């Protein structure tokens, strides 16, 4: 997955007047692969935000996370798939906008990739799903539409559009 457009985020005058570099997309994908906690923001029907930390993995250009369909965030995603994700750091920033939806039962090949990625990242935290973990549901996929990233707010804020 590669962005179709790379530009600058829009800021009010005086915020970031002379950025001198860009964040490479490879840096963003590295952060997506290595980050342990992703902050998922969905919305209630009345527009109030609902934010929750999620464990997630970045596989084949998409972000996958899992959980019960009965959780509040899962119900919100079904009601309104437009969500944001923010990675752990407030300094090395990656903010994503896109859509999330139930992924359904993954193919055997994809399930194997997902299980391996989860095991590599979260076994030390007590979570190591097997490939059949999502046969009955509980897997969600986030598709990136826009990303904003920076490693230094004043010099390299970068916007990626897909």
Language model regions located:
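Generic structural signal for secondary-structure transition and capping sites
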Residues: 36-37, 82, 123, 147
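Short histidine-centered beta-strand/loop micro-motifs
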Residues: 66-67, 75-78, 130-133, 151
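Short beta-strand segments
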Residues: 35-69, 75-77, 83-87, 95-97
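Short, solvent-exposed cationic patches
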Residues: 14-19, 70-90, 124-125
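Short, basic/aromatic recognition patches
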Residues: 12-39
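A generic local structural motif
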Residues: 24-27, 50-52, 70, 127-128
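Short amphipathic alpha-helical segments and helix-helix/interface helices
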Residues: 28-29, 74, 115
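Charged, gly/pro-rich active-site loop segments
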Residues: 1-22, 92-162
């Amino acid at each position: 997955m590669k962005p179709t457009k790379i530009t600058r985020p829009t800021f009010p005058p005086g915020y970031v007047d002379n950025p001198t570099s860009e964040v490479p997309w490879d840096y963003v994908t590295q952060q997506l692969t290595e980050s342990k906690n992703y902050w998922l923001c969905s919305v209630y029907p009345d527009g109030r935000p609902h934010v929750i930390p999620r464990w997630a993995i970045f596989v084949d250009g998409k972000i996958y996370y899992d959980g019960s369909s009965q959780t509040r965030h899962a119900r919100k995603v079904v009601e309104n798939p437009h969500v944001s994700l923010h990675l752990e750091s407030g300094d090395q920033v990656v903010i994503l906008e896109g859509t999330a939806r139930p992924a359904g039962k993954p193919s055997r090949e994809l399930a194997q990739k997902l299980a391996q990625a989860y095991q590599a990242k979260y076994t030390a935290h007590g979570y190591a799903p097997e490939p059949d973990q999502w046969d009955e549901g509980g897997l969600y996929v986030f598709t990136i539409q826009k990303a904003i990233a920076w490693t230094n707010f004043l010099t390299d804020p970068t916007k990626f559009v897909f």
